[in-house]
Amino acid sequence: VDSEHLLLAIEKEAAKAGIVQDILLEVNIGGEESKTGAAPELLWPLLDTAAAQQHIRVKGLMAIPPVNDDDAQNRRYLAQVYQLFVRAGERGYRNVEMQTLSMGMSGDFENAIREGATLVRIGTAIYGERDYSKK
């Protein structure tokens, strides 16, 4: 979830269904226009909004850092997300349980684990490159 609009839409649908929906908030740590996610400075107002809801529970953060060949830069981005994760957990928001930090994909999952990820997405490393010609 990367916006207040989406968060409130999920709240509305979860209320209709009579459930509490677990979500992750997505952070666009590199400020890339090609990626979704809230800018890091917008995470706090998004958490404030989430904490005021009755049918949403924030379970953590997710992020995809910019693709680059600079291992040190990649780790800096991942470390920044980890610091946001820790700070969000320390703030004691209602309905916020920072348990999951989803960052790292096939190309950088080792760095992500070193920097605190609890969930990595490594489909390409397991299954290989996608063949888009078969559509």
Which residue stretches match the model-derived regions?
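Conserved alpha/beta-domain cores
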Residues: V1-G107, E115, E129
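Conserved active-site alpha-helix within GNAT-family acetyltransferase domains
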Residues: E110
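C-terminal helical cap(s) of enzyme catalytic domains, especially alpha/beta-barrels
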Residues: I113-K135
